[in-house]
Each structure stands twice: as C-alpha cells, then as structure tokens.
C-alpha cells in the first residue's frame, strides 16, 4: 500500500499577481480576451509544474477560476441569472465577469450577484441564484478543457469539482420562495455528464468537495446526500472531500455513501484518526489533511507523522493539505526582508507541497530523519524571545471582570456626553476614511521606498488631514474625522505599529475576483511600544472646535484579518491586542479626543462554523472589545462600526459590546436591518447607514430623509445618528462632497421638523 500525496488546490493569482493584472487590464479594455486566456494557461502550466517539482503525486485540476470557483460551478451548470445572459443564450468569460462585477467588456451592465464569505475564511464567493422551475445543462466546459491541458502536459490529474449538495446549500432563492434542495434532481444529470466525460479521458479519481458536511445541517439536507451520490457512483472513483472542521458528527451519513474515499481536515477538525479508521468502510481510501492549507506556519512533521503512523499499512492512505492552498501565499523563498529566524518558522504553498513530499516519503520508508530536520526550527520557536513577552503574559493573566466594565451604565454616560458635546438632534458624521487620492498613495509609497524623508512625508500627511477637516466644516458635519491619509489598510496600519506582528513583501492571497490581500502575521505576544494614532488625531482636533473622532480597528477584526499564531488560542491573541489598544484609548483621551471609534466589521464573520460553538467565541470576542474600550471615562463617547448584514442571531452580543453608538450598514437593505434592533429594544445610540458608499451614485436629499424617517419609526429619533454605510476611502471627492452635502441637508430638514 504505497502512500501518495496531493493538494486540494493551489493559489491561482501567480507569484506577482499576474492573474489580477491580466484581469484588470482586460476589464479596462487595455488587452484582448485572448491575451487574458493566455495568462491563465501559462499560470496553470506553471503551477502544475511547480507542485510536481515539489513532489506532489496527484495534481488538482479545476481549482483555477477566473473569478471564483463557485461561480465557475454555476456556469458549468448553466445557472446564469437572466440579467447577465447574452442575447443569443451563449455563455462566455464576459458572462462570468458580469455575474461577478456587474459589467464586462461586452454585454449590458446589470447588478452583480451577491458576494459572501467562503465558510469561515477571508475568501469570498459569488452566491448562486435559484428560481422556481429552473433548468440546468452543461454549458461551460472550463473543467474539461483544463483536464485536457494537464493531460497533454503529461500530468497525473485529479479533477476538482464542487459537490451538488454543497453547491445548493451555498445559494439563495430569488423571487417566489421554494426549497432550493428540490433542485437536486435537476442538477445531478449535469454532474453525471461531467463525470462521464472525465471517465472517457481515463481519469481514475475525482475530488468532489462537500464542505457542507462539516456543518450542523438540517436533517433534510443530510438525507439528500445518499440519493445524490447513488446517482453519481460508478463512472470514476470519488474522493468525498471535506474541510474547515471535523466530520465525526455527520459520519453516519458519510459512511452510507457509495464513494471510494474520504478527505478529512485533521488540522481544524477534532476527528480522531483511530476512530475514523475504525468507522470508515475498510475498502475506502482515507485522505489525511495534515498540512494546514490556510496558515503560513511550518509544520512540525514529527507530530504529523505520529498522528497518522498507526494506520499505515492498514488501509489505503493519502496525505494532503487540510484544504486548498488557495488561502496561503505562494512561495516563501522570494521573501528577502524577513529576519532569518522568523523566516525559518514559515511555509507558504510551495513549501507545504515539500512538507507533503517529506511526510509521504517518511511514511513509506519509516525513516523520519528528514522530518526531524525540517521540524527543528518550529520546535526551537517555542523558546524564542521573539515569541514570548513575560510582561504581556503577566498583564493578560491579571485581567479581572472590572477591566471589561465601563465605570457607569449607558444612561449615566449619555448624560455626561450630551453635556460635553452639545450635539444637535440627528447628529451627522462619517465612518472614518476619506478618498485615498493618487497624491496620498504616491506620498505613502515614496516614503516607504525611501524617496521622501520623514519631515516632508509628515508635512504632506498634515496637509491632507487639514484638507479633510476643511471639507467637513464646509459641509456642516457635526462630528469630524481626520480622514486616515496615513493608513494604507485598517489592519496593516495597526500591525505595523504593534510588536508581535511581521509583514511579507509578496504574501498575497486572493480575497475575491482580482482583489488580493497581504495579511499581517502574528508571530508572538502583542504589545504597543508607543502611541499609534494619537499624534494625527490631536493635530486634526487642533484645527477645529468640533469633536474629531479617534479611529481604531478593533481586536477581533485585527485577529480575523491576520494569519494567527497556532501555539496559543485566538482568544489569547484577541485579548493581547485589546490590552495594547486599551492603552491607545487612554492616550487619545488624555490628548483631548472625546469620541473614539473602535471598528469591528469582522465580529460576525469570525463566528465558528457550528452554531454550538458560537457562544464561547462571542463571549471572548465581546470581552476583548470591552477590555479595549472600558478604560474610557463617562464623558468619552465610544463608537463602533460594523458593515455586514445579519444581526438577528447575535443581537445579545452586539448589545453586550456596550458601545455608546453603533454605526451599521443598512442602506442596501432599505433599513430592514433595524428590525433586529427594534425587536431587541437596543438601548444605546445607532447610526444606520443612509447611503451605499460602494456605488458612485449620489443619493438625493429626499431619499435620505425618507430612509431616516423610516428609521425613526423603529428607533427613537433622539438615539439616531446620520452617516454613510462605510468608509469613503474608495470614492472620489466629487461624489463624496455631493453625497455628504445631501446627507447634511436631510438631517437639517429633519431638525426643522
């Protein structure tokens, strides 16, 4: 029984983000479709070759996507919303881009499909839309073409296909409501056709992804798996693939399926290998997801070997990444600025392929010398002074319940704040950032590259802050912001100023479409060596008599949008960040800043996949926010901002944050979101976003007034604020001025009654 290895998928964008550049060039009309397709072909060939050279036996094919793999599956099945269809009914790459972006070089623009998080990762997928009586047919043959490409290059191919039940689970019904699971029998013939085509090409194994099997699914959805896979059996061997959590709770459903193998995530799941071996049919192959596909740490391969060695020789076994390597940067070797010790702790996608080769060889031969050598740096890290800061650990251990409580309840604080700020009814403000113009970006880049000295850089930033204050005063806003000209990214900026983080040059991962992010990496205990935001907030406040908000990114969001440590809990990391930022709140307050906003857009998206795990997460997530904020005096007003759409199921936790003011994204839902706050009888102040900053459209005064009147039917007017949905960083100044002028006018009209 020779053990093989494989990956579940590989990053698509290219080491230098070649895919992003090709996409954006094509969208802008600067290159042809053929040039775009050529870049895709070259990237796929390179990535297959790189994996093969790194020692991977079975190469994933079908993991590449022009925008997103769920969207690719929609096209495969012929699921194209009517508004995005070509007039002749054909499907091409522009159809795909219209669904993803709302527009493409050809065809009529139409509202893009909804985008949401892929399970609990920072990757986003385009939500499939389903209508009653919908028809499906094999329409987009990208998978088959890529399999032909890989076979022609002589590769050992393992096609990757998103499974039918998970595909339906990820979608939403549009128009007349019905049970989308009822479409299962309509999509299965397309899957059968695809599997038949793969069998014709001599394919032995197909990786069929059903990550929904790690969720707490309704019984009807669990029951759907057996008939679905009864219909799909027989043409090729199916590797039922799960990830991001364990499968033990749904193992009875899984073991009844007519498949030939199961992939389990042994990094994020709590499945016991011996128990899995005992319960799986003896003729099934087990694919052990031992190498973390969604973090950047080198694996301790001696531990991984010990985890799996007892079942070697007892059943067919493959070793694999826990999930697709899509969530990891590509290649550590090009990072030239990382300290040698720190660099030795990391493994990016290509290094993870090498880890799989080392593990396969050791399991086949029994010789573990290479594993011990590879694991030495990560074992040495446990004792590194770069990791452990006794002062931070001592401070964390000393936290008491008192540290997460404001001195007084909201009613007492609100009175002190009213006396201090004397704001009018319907107070107006913005969420934080103003347009990041070419001048601002060039200024930061020149400083970063060393082409500009610190004095000239500071003079330039001060000028942009001054401009933002002047603009806001001219518009008549009540509570101002400094505009964040000095910040490139709301997480990276704080990470750069906190001890315990490092940054890469090329550690890009895909977020969606052509958007890539370069998350900071938490390498050790986190502390704040010096104030971060105080100087610029103080300068901005010196320019005006109106209150200027201090702007912080909250601890849970910094955690969720970084690569975390694996040797301590997420709770520990969040609370360390909270303590560091608590000192920032105290310093802002001492500098005369009376309103401080702590953004937590990621609080909800950090929720565990299983609802039974939610309470523990929300408890420490809320506590981290409160530790961050509770140092503030009664007359300091704490704001928070959240930009997502589902509050109903976490209202208790949102109220428990005890922020004096919460601003939320509501314009696209026509204030429907406020229902949750009304039903819950939310006690503090709320700023429902009155216009969508993601659109260049300028809302009219009447439209904003109507939304605010609607809001006032649900929330008492004396507790309402007036603000946009989100920060204005991506907008231009002309539409920003026009939209804010209308927003201020609407508030003034309401004050006059």
Swiss-Prot record:
Its cofactor is Zn(2+). The keyword Amino-acid biosynthesis applies. Coiled coil: none annotated. Binds 1 zinc ion per subunit. 5-methyltetrahydropteroyltri-L-glutamate binds at residues 17-20, 117, 515-516, 561, 605. The active site is at residue 694. Zn(2+) binds at residues 641, 643, 665, 726. It is an enzyme of class 2 (transferase). It catalyses: 5-methyltetrahydropteroyltri-L-glutamate + L-homocysteine = tetrahydropteroyltri-L-glutamate + L-methionine. Pathway: Amino-acid biosynthesis; L-methionine biosynthesis via de novo pathway; L-methionine from L-homocysteine (MetE route): step 1/1. One of its GO terms (molecular function) is zinc ion binding. Catalyzes the transfer of a methyl group from 5-methyltetrahydrofolate to homocysteine resulting in methionine formation. Belongs to the vitamin-B12 independent methionine synthase family. This is 5-methyltetrahydropteroyltriglutamate--homocysteine methyltransferase. The lineage of its organism: Bacteria, Pseudomonadati, Pseudomonadota, Gammaproteobacteria, Enterobacterales.
């Amino acid at each position: 029984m020779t053990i093989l290895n494989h990956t579940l998928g590989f990053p698509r964008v290219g080491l230098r983000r070649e895919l992003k550049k090709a996409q954006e060039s094509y969208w802008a009309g600067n290159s042809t479709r053929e040039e775009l397709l050529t870049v895709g072909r070259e990237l796929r060939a390179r990535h297959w070759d790189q994996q093969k050279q790194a020692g991977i036996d079975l190469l994933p094919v079908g993991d590449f996507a022009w925008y997103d793999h769920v969207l690719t599956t929609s096209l495969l099945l012929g699921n194209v919303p009517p508004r995005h269809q070509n007039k002749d009914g054909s499907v091409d790459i522009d159809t795909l881009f219209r669904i993803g972006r709302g527009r493409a070089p050809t065809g009529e623009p139409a509202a893009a499909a909804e985008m949401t998080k892929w399970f609990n990762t920072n990757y986003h997928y385009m939500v499939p839309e389903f209508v009653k009586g919908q028809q499906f047919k094999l329409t987009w043959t990208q998978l088959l073409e890529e399999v032909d490409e890989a076979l022609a290059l002589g590769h050992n191919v393992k096609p990757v296909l998103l499974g039918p039940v998970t595909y339906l689970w990820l979608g939403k019904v549009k128009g007349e409501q019905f049970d989308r699971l009822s479409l299962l029998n309509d999509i299965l013939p397309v899957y059968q056709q695809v599997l038949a085509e793969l069998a014709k090409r001599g394919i032995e194994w197909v990786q069929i992804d059903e990550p929904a099997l790690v969720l707490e699914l309704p019984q009807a959805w669990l029951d759907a798996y057996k008939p679905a896979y009864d219909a799909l059996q027989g043409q090729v061997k199916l590797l039922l693939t799960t990830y991001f959590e364990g499968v033990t709770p749904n193992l009875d459903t899984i073991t009844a399926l007519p498949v030939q193998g199961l992939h389990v995530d042994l990094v994020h799941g709590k499945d016991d290998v011996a128990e899995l071996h005992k319960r799986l049919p003896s003729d099934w192959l087990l694919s052990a997801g031992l190498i973390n596909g969604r973090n950047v740490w080198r694996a301790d391969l001696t531990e991984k070997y010990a985890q799996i060695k007892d079942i070697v020789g007892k059943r067919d076994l493959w070793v694999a990444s826990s999930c697709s390597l899509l969530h990891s940067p590509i290649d550590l070797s090009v990072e030239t600025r990382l300290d040698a010790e720190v660099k030795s702790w990391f493994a990016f996608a290509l290094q993870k392929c090498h880890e799989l080769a080392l593990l396969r060889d050791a399991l086949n031969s029994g010789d573990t010398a290479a594993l011990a050598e590879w694991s030495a740096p990560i074992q040495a890290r446990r004792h590194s002074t770069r990791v452990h800061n006794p002062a931070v650990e001592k401070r964390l251990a000393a936290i008491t319940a008192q540290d997460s409580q404001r001195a007084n309840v909201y009613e007492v604080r609100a009175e002190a704040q009213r006396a201090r700020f004397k704001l009018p009814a319907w107070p107006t403000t913005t969420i934080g950032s103003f347009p990041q113009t070419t001048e601002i970006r060039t200024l930061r880049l020149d400083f970063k590259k060393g082409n500009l000295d610190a004095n000239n850089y500071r003079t330039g930033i001060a000028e942009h802050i001054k401009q933002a204050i002047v603009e806001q005063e001219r518009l008549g806003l009540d509570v101002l912001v400094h505009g964040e000209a000095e910040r490139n990214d709301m997480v990276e900026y704080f990470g750069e100023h906190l001890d315990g983080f490092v940054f890469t040059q090329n550690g890009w991962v895909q977020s969606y479409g052509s958007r890539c992010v370069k998350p900071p990496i938490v390498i050790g205990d986190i502390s704040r060596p010096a104030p971060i935001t105080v100087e610029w907030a103080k300068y901005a406040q010196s320019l005006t008599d109106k209150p200027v908000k201090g702007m912080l990114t909250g601890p849970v969001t910094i955690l969720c949008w970084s690569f975390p440590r694996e040797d301590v809990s997420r709770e520990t990391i969040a609370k360390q960040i909270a303590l560091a930022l608590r000192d920032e709140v105290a310093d802002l307050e001492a500098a005369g800043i009376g309103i401080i906003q702590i953004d937590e857009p990621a609080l909800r998206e950090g929720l565990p996949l299983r609802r039974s795990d939610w309470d523990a997460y929300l408890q420490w997530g809320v506590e981290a926010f409160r530790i961050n904020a509770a140092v503030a005096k009664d007359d300091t007003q704490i704001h928070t901002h959240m930009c997502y759409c589902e509050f109903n199921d976490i209202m208790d936790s949102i109220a428990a944050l005890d922020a004096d003011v919460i601003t939320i994204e509501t314009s696209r839902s026509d204030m429907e979101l406020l229902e949750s706050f009304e039903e819950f009888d939310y006690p503090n102040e709320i700023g429902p976003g009155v216009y969508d900053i993601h659109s260049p459209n300028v809302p009219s005064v009447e439209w904003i007034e109507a939304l605010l009147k609607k809001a006032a039917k649900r929330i008492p007017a004396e507790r309402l604020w007036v603000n946009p949905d989100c920060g204005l960083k991506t907008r231009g100044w002309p539409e920003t001025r026009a939209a804010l002028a209308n927003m201020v006018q609407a508030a003034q009209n309401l004050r006059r009654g």
